[in-house]
Amino acid sequence: MRAPLLSLLLFACWPLMAFGGAQIYEPLADSVRGRLSRMVADRAPATMHFRSAADGQRWLAEMDKRLERRIPDRQQRLELLRAVQYEATRARLDPQLVLGVIEVESAFRKYAVSRAGARGYMQVMPFWVNLIGQPGHNLFHLRTNLAYGCAILRHYLDIENGDYFRALGRYNGSLGQPQYPRSVLAAWKIRWKYDGPTG
């Protein structure tokens, strides 16, 4: 009786657990460290960048609808979506990919913490603050978390010459294991796919 109850409880709590792996500390060349530091230091207002205001409004309305079940507070949803679009575009990433990463990493929970200690929406490991940031950077702060997550993912995509599968494995600390990259790619291409302009 106890084992089935425990299994049911674990299954029910699965969406509350963060998938975040343990991003692995790797020494960075000074030029790479400098580039990533500049990316996470930006404090400009998170303004969405689209070819036209109408394109931006269509994207925001569609993503707002898709995210409603996961984040009931509309103001919080819109703030997250605007910041995702801004930080992803700055890092030359598809905002839809970033939404897929957030879904798998933290299930859209701002204060998620993995067993390895990764934090926030994009499950960033604290060592990155010492490596490329400043001591006051709070990884639970929306813009800070997204700036770090997008900069790190861009870095791994550059290392892997655009290979999403390998870059996502690096991001999660599970390079060579298929489960995490497949989960993110499925979320990106199925739940977050958007055929209109994303930036």
Task: Please state what every model-predicted region is.
Residues M1-P4:
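Positively charged n-region of N-terminal signal peptides that target proteins for export
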Residues W14-L16, A29, S37, Y121, ...:
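Low-complexity, intrinsically disordered short peptide segments enriched in small/polar/basic residues
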Residues D42-G199:
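Catalytic glycan-binding domains that act on GlcNAc-containing polysaccharides
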Residues A22-M39:
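Short N-terminal segments immediately surrounding and downstream of signal-peptide cleavage
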Residues S7-P15:
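Bacterial N-terminal signal peptides
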